[in-house]
Amino acid sequence: FDRSLDGKDSRFLTKLYKRAFWPLSERNTLPKMEEGGLNVVLSTSYIPEIEWVDDQKLIKFLKWLYPSVNERVFNPTYFDATNAMMDRMEAEVEKYNESEPSKKFRFVKNIQELEECIVDHEIAMIHSVEGGHSLNGELAKKRVEESTALKPLVEGEILKNLEHFYDRGVAYLTLAHFYPNHLVSPVFPYPEYGIKSSNWKQLMAGWDMNKGLTSTGKKVVQAMKDM
């Protein structure tokens, strides 16, 4: 939602409720990280699931209010949108470094680059991804229940995309987020007040704590262990 990491050009939505919970508020900036003496920062990319957009009226309104965000975040595949988010983070860091701060930020892809970054007294940035749905490409673009016939092809695409994230330097991937995906069925992520204050129709309809990992999810976990 067009937050600026240098803290100089924040949009209206990011300034709301700075002292209370608001998922779009700006909580951190690169200057704050530098001032706080951080050595390593996890840069987590999260793309909202389509079911969440359908369930939450506020998000539907924001899609209409910010068409550029809709085009960038919700229209592409989860995989493409996640890569675009990481591209943008890297561009923001590069732009900030050009302003000649006292400490440079650098995205690192492996242990060797991390160690070099620390020796050089730079702040290491490491990519991470929240939600296994970010592995979904064109074949997996449809909702989980609609793509059963494509399962072998979807599984191959997911494993290929996982390897891409690894090569890009993603340090970890959470399997689940709010909704079931091709890897796993999650537990409900919110306390009771969250159920009352929001419409979780699609989540509650498909919520089953006994399902756990799918066969594809087990292969993804094994692949991550091997990596």
Regions found by a protein language model. Name each.
Residues 1-215, 219-222:
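N-terminal hydrophobic targeting/anchoring segments and the immediately downstream early-domain regions
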Residues 223-227:
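Short, intrinsically disordered, charge-balanced linker/junction segments flanking boundaries
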